[in-house]
């Protein structure tokens, strides 16, 4: 049996421990070699075959000295496995503290003393005792569990190991104290495959205890006499030494096992006299244990008897439930009386012989620890005993019984496994053994109890403390993560104490507080039970006899205190110094009292172990391995009727519960069990948690409780490594969410629900902080339910939604939770609740209902549909968006989130700060975003969610394509939705787990936001809703909120998707959507209702809040999507608010920061995708506002264009677009507070978040972000523009907004923008596009396009009418139709997408558009590449520069189209800026000016594209001025617009030109190497102009390259000027490429000479000369720019040089530089 194996291993391990001890202390593997060799030879044979040892070489290295332990050599594989699994870190966590001193002392004098005492004890004990003493010595000194570790080492080789042992002995000695070694021992033992999985570990402690105790009776009496001195001595030395010295007999075989498994030391401590556990656990515990051993020398036998009795009782229990019962009953009978030990001793009848004792204990071991036996955890009969104990111990005891069942099972497992993961398993085992510990205490309250309960639990708990234990789990997670640290139990015990104390001091105190709270809240009954039971003065802890096993609450505070105390030398010395008798007994009792907490902590290790067990495959095996484990299960079932079925879970769960015991043992058992068990249990334990959260609300609970919960989640999730690491991450990093994410959808939902709860928590706002934390922790822990509930409970929300809806929802319908809990909680949140409230009045009822009704809404999807159709759905969306944001915000700025403004602030602060924090804090973001991402990603998680999902959408797989094929949109969204709610969530959870990285989180966040925004904007909901449309079944999850949401949201989505899809239905849908979108907007923006209700004012504010929040939350997790979406929406929302846009700017600023990063990225992608399909992009990008904007611009722009072109049809088509374009307008108008607000709301509905943000600002946002314009900067710029023009000309404003879209729509779809501008009213879209700045520019462009719409629209948009309709479109009604139409066209154009053709059918000018689409496609193909990059480049421009940058970006984005647009934008911008809204008025006029500038601008833009890359505000401004100057030439402007048709010929000529192609390449390179960004302008101007002047090159870097170029190199520049601007552009592009100093090595004179010769040749051959001049300019510039490291860009110049056939030296230089650059 595993018991036999363990016994064998223990016997073998016993020699090994001795050897280890000797080898460790004396270096001699000789003492252990003879004994160890026989076992080592066989075991290593088996173990060498095990690859586990190699798996953990770090451990093995320390184990090197121990290889003589053949038997344990086998154990190390499992131990190593467990070590790898990661539960051990927690087991190690506790032990390291006790071991920390122990290894040191032992290393110094303790080693010898320990050896001596161990050997002496061993001598007393004969071989088995000797082996245990050796082990004890290893334990006492090594209790580091290096003995097992040596077998680990030995695993590598048996004979070789001996040799290695000789080599590694010394290291082993060192390693004795080394974490790896102790770790290895613990882990080794834990990974005692059979021990951990089977009763081996279990029995090992018990038998060892018996063995130890049999010898301990004889030897413990002797040895106790010795040990009292030795123990005190060793106590002062080290807990390990004390353990070794204190309880050689007790430690005996157990010591072997303890040595084998330092983690088991706790269990060992259980079985071993208190001295063992105490010494093992730390000074205090050791003192107590030593007190038990040394002070109660006479009690030592009793302790021996008692441990023997429990052990044997366990054995008997395993063997006979009656004996078990008797023993168990005896234990209860004598909670603290030693006499009970004697009665228990007969059942235990510890084998007289050490081997029998060892065998029996091992046999017992399979069952559980003696304490476990005490728990009666094995026998059904025992449960009554435990139940009496439970009754005695009070309410907490039943939970403990519950815990004990699991705990005992876990204790059996835990002892089996806990030996390795001494801390966690011990904790768990002791948690299980806590009642037995009581019983043992009852059995005499002798050392056995202390070793088991006090020593193990209190020591374990103390080493880790309630909070500390979490910390220790964390630390040891790290230890586990970093085997070096966990290598040695003893060493890390020493090392661990500092890490552990980090948590211990603070967390132990906090844990003490939290535990005190938990004791008050959870352990109240326990305290009641305990106080009467305690025999010792320390009643709270003393209740150990009555409550010890069941006194997690009491034990917790005291344990924390005890932990702090045992950890603190003061306590330890006092215990050591104090009389070994009463003080030690008292301490022992205290520790016994603490012991339950240790047991609770132990379950954590069990949970961790279980998490590791899955890794090792023993989690189930743990329970399964032995009948005794099953009896444990049986007992668990019996004592824990509630959780009888949860036994397995309970083992894990109880481990978690006990681990979370700091929270509430009574709760935690439920929490533990229910979490694995399911919603019911979850609700129950959540209720418990709700009762207990306040105590653990503190950081201790957060750290420990959260960690514990994390442990629960890993336990539940069987995350194993990750789970524990997650726990650690959560407590330390707060990243635990991920772990539990993958654990189970419910857990995910718990997380989500936690978010929902967090939202709800946000409702209680004040609690949000806690909710956030707890939510993060719990969510992270995957105990969103308990977490949330607890959190809700903690948070005065009482979160009925959480408790009722949330818990039920979480249990019942995660989706509902998500949808409702979230919306409910959202509703609960004043902000969204109010918005939703007054949005629907259901929201009002929902607000009152918020929690209740939301839950009901959650429950009542119909209600959600009816009331929360949008309300719930809105709430859901808001919950998603807003709640997500709020939740994210809650996570970040919980308290702020608590307030609407707090939410706003949260959004803002969160967005700017916390968004980045979240971005930075992947954990939180991961928690929130992952949760959200899990949720939204789940929805979006076709691939990774928004990433895949967005790209699906944004790639045209989403948005337009999805939109274009709304079916496909639905399909995709259905996919998304189907995916999203359930599949996707789970997938996403997995993805999040797998892809929880910030990237994925960003993706998920982005996608989440995008999804949310899309859903909110219709994208997410759209997919969700289409999914709902496709099947409302999915709406269940998504449709939960989508269900009701789905209809309206679908409607809205439809409207939006149709708007996106631009199908006429969208008109109806738009109307619907306007209805819906009011709430949809609220929903989407989390502001629709509010926005709708208070569209201009309230909504704007609320929208601002929500938008900001959504935006920021979006940033937070939507990042790009939300950033764009909400960002834009925020701006508009804020714009709606008037000055709000600035906060959005703020928000955007923060959001832009990372959105800049992310958004930039997405923007480029977005922009490309968005260009591809505005609808699609919009749909896609609904969440991805940036390019949704772009889209929005395309859509909005185009929508406006289309709206202009085909007001009606496009409106139908563009309803959503128009809507959200209108929305943009409406937003902008919303800002004005026009009826457009309704439309805005509808637009928001459509694009709820999208219109708001997407309308223009999202694009601007993204664009700005992309450009780094400081989105806030130029988004406010945009906002201001939008705001000013918005107020003045709401269409223009939306255009402004659209300009943001157009802006990077310019980048992205500058053509679209251009088309948009042209199509749009110049001002409206111009403003919007030009971001007002170049939105005006664009407005001019729009005017330009508007003026030349026939031309442009003919050429580009081919739509004069629509363009003219732009004015009406400005009105927003007609515009959107045109816009919609146009957007497709623009999108077509912008992306070169065939949307134009789609639009074609819709728009009469679509063919023109198509041409532009092609041209623009080419143009945009280049421009977006360039543009997207340039926009990214522009990202750095300031707001004012942003306008210029926008111009530049437009130019850069459109490269060619951008020049047109930028020329137009410059002129238009000036005009529009001057006119503000003169877009419509100046349409015709600006068009022409735009045209004129456009060609000029075009060359510039190429140049400027580089400049844009340079992102020089002056350059941009110069470009703008230049463009403005050039704005007078209408024809060129038209070509730019015509650029698609006519200019494209020119532009494409160059593009087609080799140089142009090269330029494109160079541009790409330039974009890639933006390092040259600032250089690019210099190259452009300097390239042509600065050829002659090096200094001038730098100066001209930011000057117009065109004019200076001409003046600088008259011939070549003139030629260049004379050359088609396309050529110049080509040059510019080439220059762009050349802007890198082509010839850094070339001297200015040489370059000039070459240049002159080239110029001459250029005069002869202008083309060559121009190229040469470009090269020369690059070369000359290289002179100047050479220093900045522009040499790298030389790669680009070489090609032009080659192409221009520059002189040999130049090519040589170029080639050399090329090579250099390439090499670089």
Curated annotation (Swiss-Prot):
Localization (cell): Nucleus; Cytoplasm, Cytoskeleton; Chromosome
Alphabetized Pfam families for the sequence: Tankyrase_bdg_C
Extent of Polar residues compositional bias: 266-287, 317-327, 449-459, 1402-1411, 1428-1457, 1515-1527
Biased composition (Basic residues): 1568-1577
Phosphoserine PTM sites in chain numbering: 14, 178, 220, 286, 300, 429, 437, 496, 500, 539, 568, 602, 673, 692, 713, 763, 796, 807, 845, 866, 871, 876, 887, 912, 976, 980, 1006, 1017, 1022, 1047, 1063, 1084, 1096, 1126, 1131, 1171, 1212, 1241, 1246, 1290, 1321, 1324, 1373, 1375, 1425, 1429, 1437, 1440, 1442, 1463, 1466, 1496, 1549, 1611-1612, 1622, 1643, 1657, 1706
Chain positions covered by the region annotation Acidic: 209-1563
Biased composition (Low complexity): 296-316, 502-518, 742-758, 1477-1489, 1671-1690
GO CC terms: adherens junction; CCR4-NOT complex; cytoskeleton; cytosol; heterochromatin; nucleus
Predominant place of localization: nucleus
GO BP field: cellular response to ionizing radiation; double-strand break repair
InterPro entries referenced in this protein's UniProt entry, alphabetically: Tankyrase-bd_C, TNKS1BP1-like
Region annotation Disordered: where it falls in the sequence: 1-137, 185-472, 485-595, 659-720, 734-924, 955-1081, 1128-1153, 1198-1255, 1358-1546, 1567-1720
GO function term, MF aspect, one: enzyme binding
Superkingdom per UniProt: Eukaryota
Post-translational modification: ADP-ribosylated by TNKS1.
Sequence motif Nuclear localization signal, location on chain: 1620-1626, 1714-1719
Keyword Metal-binding: no
Assembly: Binds to the ANK repeat domain of TNKS1 and TNKS2.
PANTHER family with a match to the protein in the record: 182 KDA TANKYRASE-1-BINDING PROTEIN (PTHR22042:SF2), TANKYRASE 1 BINDING PROTEIN (PTHR22042)
Protein name from the UniProt record: 182 kDa tankyrase-1-binding protein
Organism (species): Mus musculus (Mouse)
């Amino acid at each position: 049996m595993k018991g036999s194996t363990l016994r064998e291993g223990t016997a073998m391990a016993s020699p090994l421990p001795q050897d280890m001890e000797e080898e460790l202390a004396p270096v001699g593997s000789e003492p252990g070699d003879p004994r160890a060799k026989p076992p080592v030879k066989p075991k290593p044979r088996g173990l060498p075959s095990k690859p586990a040892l190699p798996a953990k070489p770090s451990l093995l290295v320390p184990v090197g000295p121990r290889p003589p332990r053949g038997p344990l050599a086998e154990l190390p594989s499992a131990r190593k496995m467990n070590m790898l699994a990661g539960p051990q870190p927690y087991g190690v966590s506790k032990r390291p503290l006790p071991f920390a001193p122990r290894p040191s002392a032992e290393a110094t004098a303790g080693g010898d003393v320990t050896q001596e005492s161990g050997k002496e004890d061993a001598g007393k004990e004969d071989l088995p005792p000797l082996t245990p003493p050796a082990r004890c010595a290893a334990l006492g000194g090594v209790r580091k569990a290096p003995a097992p570790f040596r077998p680990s080492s030995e695993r590598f080789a048996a004979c070789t190991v001996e040799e290695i042992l000789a080599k590694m002995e010394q290291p082993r000695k060192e390693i004795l104290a080394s974490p790896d070694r102790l770790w290895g021992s613990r882990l080794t033992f834990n990974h005692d495959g059979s021990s951990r999985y089977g009763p081996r570990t279990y029995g090992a402690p018990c038998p060892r205890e018996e063995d130890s105790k049999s010898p301990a009776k004889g030897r413990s009496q002797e040895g106790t006499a010795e040990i009292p001195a030795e123990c005190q001595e060793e106590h002062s030395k080290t807990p390990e030494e004390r353990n070794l010295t204190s309880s050689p007999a007790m430690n005996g075989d157990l010591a072997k096992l303890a040595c084998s498994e330092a983690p088991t030391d706790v269990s060992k401590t259980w079985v071993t006299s208190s001295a063992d556990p105490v010494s093992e656990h730390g000074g205090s515990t050791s003192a107590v244990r030593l007190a038990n051993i040394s002070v109660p020398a006479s009690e030592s036998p009793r302790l021996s008897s008692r441990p023997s009795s429990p052990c044997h009782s366990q054995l008997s229990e395993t063997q006979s439930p009656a004996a078990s019962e008797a023993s168990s009953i005896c234990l209860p009978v004598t909670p603290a009386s030693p006499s009970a030990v004697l009665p228990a001793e007969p059942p235990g009848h510890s084998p007289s012989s050490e081997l029998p004792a060892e065998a029996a204990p091992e046999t017992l071991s399979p069952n559980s620890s003696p304490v476990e036996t005490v728990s009666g955890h094995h026998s059904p009969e025992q449960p009554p005993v435990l139940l009496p104990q439970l009754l005695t111990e009070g309410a907490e005891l039943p939970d403990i019984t519950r815990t004990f069942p699991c705990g005992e099972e876990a204790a059996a497992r835990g002892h089996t496994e806990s030996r390795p993961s001494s801390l966690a398993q011990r904790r768990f085992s002791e948690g299980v053994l806590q009642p037995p510990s009581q019983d043992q205490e009852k059995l005499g309250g002798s050392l056995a109890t202390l070793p088991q309960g006090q020593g193990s639990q209190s020591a374990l708990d103390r080493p880790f403390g309630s909070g500390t234990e979490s910390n220790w789990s964390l630390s040891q997670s790290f230890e586990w993560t970093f085997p070096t640290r966990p290598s040695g139990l003893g060493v890390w015990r020493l090392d661990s104490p500092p890490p552990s104390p980090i948590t211990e001091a603070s967390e132990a105190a906090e844990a003490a507080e939290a535990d005190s709270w938990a004791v008050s809240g959870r352990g109240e009954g326990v305290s009641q039970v305990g106080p009467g039971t305690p025999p010792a003065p320390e009643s709270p802890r003393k209740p150990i006899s009555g409550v010890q096993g069941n006194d997690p609450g009491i034990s917790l505070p005291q344990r924390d205190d005890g932990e702090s105390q045992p950890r603190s030398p003061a306590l330890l010395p006092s215990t050591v110094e104090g009389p070994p008798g009463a003080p030690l007994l008292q301490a022992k009792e205290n520790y016994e009292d603490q012991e339950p907490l240790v047991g609770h902590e132990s379950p954590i290790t069990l949970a961790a172990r279980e998490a590791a067990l899955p890794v090792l495959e023993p989690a189930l095996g743990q329970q399964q391995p032995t009948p005794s484990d099953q009896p444990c299960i049986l007992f668990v079932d019996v004592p824990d009727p509630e959780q009888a079925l949860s036994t397995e879970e309970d083992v894990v769960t109880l481990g978690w519960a006990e681990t979370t015991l700091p929270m509430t043992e009574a709760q935690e058992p439920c929490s533990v069990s229910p979490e694995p068990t399911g919603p019911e249990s979850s609700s129950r334990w959540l209720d418990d948690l709700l009762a207990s959260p306040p105590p653990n609300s503190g950081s201790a609970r957060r750290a420990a409780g959260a960690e514990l919960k994390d442990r629960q989640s890993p336990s539940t999730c069987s995350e194993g490594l990750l789970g524990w690491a997650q726990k650690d991450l959560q407590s330390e990093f707060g990243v635990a969410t991920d772990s539990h994410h993958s654990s189970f959808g419910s857990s995910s939902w718990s997380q989500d629900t936690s978010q929902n709860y967090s939202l709800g928590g946000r409702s209680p706002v004040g609690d949000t902080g806690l909710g956030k934390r707890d939510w993060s922790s719990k969510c992270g822990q995957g105990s969103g339910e308990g977490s949330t509930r607890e959190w809700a409970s903690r948070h005065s929300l009482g979160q009925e939604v959480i408790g009722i809806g949330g818990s039920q929802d979480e249990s019942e319908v995660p989706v509902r939770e998500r949808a409702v809990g979230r919306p409910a909680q959202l509703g609960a949140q004043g902000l969204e609740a109010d918005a939703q409230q007054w949005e629907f009045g259901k929201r009002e009822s929902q607000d009152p209902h918020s929690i209740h009704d939301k839950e009901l809404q959650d429950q009542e999807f119909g209600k959600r549909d009816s009331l929360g159709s949008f309300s719930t759905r809105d709430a859901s969306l808001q919950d998603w968006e807003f709640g997500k944001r709020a939740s994210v915000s809650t996570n970040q700025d919980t308290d702020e989130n608590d307030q609407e403004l707090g939410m706003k602030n949260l959004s803002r602060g969160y967005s700017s700060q916390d968004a980045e924090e979240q971005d930075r804090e992947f954990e939180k973001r991961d928690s929130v975003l992952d949760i959200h991402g899990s949720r939204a990603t789940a929805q979006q998680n076709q691939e990774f969610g928004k990433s895949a999902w967005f790209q699906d959408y944004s790639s045209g797989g989403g948005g337009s394509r999805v939109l274009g094929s709304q079916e496909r949109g639905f399909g995709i969204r259905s996919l998304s939705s189907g995916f999203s709610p359930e599949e996707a969530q789970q997938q996403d959870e997995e993805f999040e787990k797998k892809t929880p990285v910030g990237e994925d989180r960003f993706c998920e966040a982005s996608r989440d936001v995008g999804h949310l925004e899309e859903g909110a904007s219709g994208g997410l909901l759209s997919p969700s809703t289409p999914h709902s449309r496709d099947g409302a079944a999915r709406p269940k999850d998504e449709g939960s909120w989508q269900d009701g949401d789905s209809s309206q949201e679908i409607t809205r989505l439809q409207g939006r998707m149709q708007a996106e899809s631009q199908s006429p239905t969208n008109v109806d849908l738009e109307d619907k959507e306007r209805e819906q979108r009011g709430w949809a907007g609220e929903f989407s923006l989390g502001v629709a209702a509010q926005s709708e209700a208070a569209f201009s004012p309230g909504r704007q504010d609320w929208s601002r809040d929500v938008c900001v929040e959504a935006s920021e939350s979006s940033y937070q997790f939507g990042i790009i999507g939300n950033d764009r979406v909400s960002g834009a929406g925020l701006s508009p929302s804020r714009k709606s608010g008037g000055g709000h846009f600035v906060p959005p700017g703020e928000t955007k600023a923060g959001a832009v920061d990372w959105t800049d990063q992310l958004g930039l990225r997405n923007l480029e992608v977005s922009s490309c995708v968005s260009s591809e399909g505005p609808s699609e992009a919009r749909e896609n990008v609904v969440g991805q506002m940036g390019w949704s904007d772009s889209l929005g611009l395309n859509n909005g722009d185009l929508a406006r264009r289309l709206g202009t072109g085909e007001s009606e049809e496009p409106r139908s088509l563009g309803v959503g677009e128009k809507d959200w374009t209108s929305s943009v307008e409406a937003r902008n108008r919303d800002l004005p507070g026009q009826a457009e607000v309704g439309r805005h709301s509808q637009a928001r509905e459509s694009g709820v978040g999208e219109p708001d943000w997407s309308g223009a600002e999202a694009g601007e946002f993204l664009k700005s972000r992309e450009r780094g314009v400081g989105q806030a900067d130029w988004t406010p710029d945009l906002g201001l523009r939008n705001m000013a023009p918005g107020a003045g000309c709401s269409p223009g404003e939306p255009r402004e907004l659209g300009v943001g879209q157009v802006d990077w729509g310019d980048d992205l779809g500058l053509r679209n923008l251009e088309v948009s501008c042209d199509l749009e009213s110049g001002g409206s879209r111009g403003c919007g596009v030009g971001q007002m700045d170049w939105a005006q520019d664009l407005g001019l462009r729009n005017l330009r396009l508007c003026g030349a719409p026939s031309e442009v629209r003919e050429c580009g948009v081919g739509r004069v009418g629509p363009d003219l309709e732009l004015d009406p479109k400005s009105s927003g009604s007609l515009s959107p139709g045109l816009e919609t139409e146009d957007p497709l066209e623009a999108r077509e154009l912008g992306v070169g997408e065939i949307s134009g053709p789609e639009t074609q059918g819709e728009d009469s000018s679509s063919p023109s558009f198509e041409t532009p689409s092609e041209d623009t496609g080419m143009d945009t193909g280049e421009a977006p590449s360039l543009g997207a990059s340039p926009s990214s480049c522009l990202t750095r421009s300031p707001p004012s520069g942003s306008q210029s940058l926008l111009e530049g970006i437009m130019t850069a984005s459109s490269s060619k189209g951008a020049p047109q647009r930028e020329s137009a934008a410059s002129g238009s911008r000036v005009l529009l800026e001057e006119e503000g809204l003169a877009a419509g008025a100046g349409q015709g006029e600006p068009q022409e000016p735009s045209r004129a500038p456009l060609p000029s601008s075009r060359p510039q833009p190429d140049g400027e594209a580089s400049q844009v890359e340079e992102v020089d505000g002056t350059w941009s401004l110069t470009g703008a001025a230049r463009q403005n100057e050039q704005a007078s030439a209408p024809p060129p402007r038209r070509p730019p617009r015509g650029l698609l048709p006519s200019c494209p010929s020119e532009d494409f000529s160059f593009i087609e030109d080799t140089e142009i192609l090269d330029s494109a390449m160079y541009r790409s390179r330039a974009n890639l190497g933006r390092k040259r960004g600032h250089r690019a302008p210099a190259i452009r101007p300097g390239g042509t102009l600065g050829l002659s002047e090096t200094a001038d090159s730098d100066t001209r870097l930011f000057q117009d390259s065109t004019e200076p170029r001409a003046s600088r190199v008259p011939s070549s520049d003139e030629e260049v000027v004379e050359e088609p601007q396309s050529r110049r552009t080509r040059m510019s592009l080439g220059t762009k490429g050349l802007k890198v100093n082509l010839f850094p090595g070339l001297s200015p004179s040489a370059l000039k000479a070459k240049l002159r010769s080239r110029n001459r040749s250029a005069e002869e051959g202008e083309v060559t000369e121009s190229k040469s001049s470009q090269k020369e300019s690059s070369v000359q510039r290289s002179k100047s720019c050479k220093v900045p490291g522009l040499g790298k860009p030389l790669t680009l110049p070489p090609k032009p040089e080659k192409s221009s056939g520059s002189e040999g030296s130049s090519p040589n230089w170029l080639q050399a530089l090329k090579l250099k650059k390439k090499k670089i």
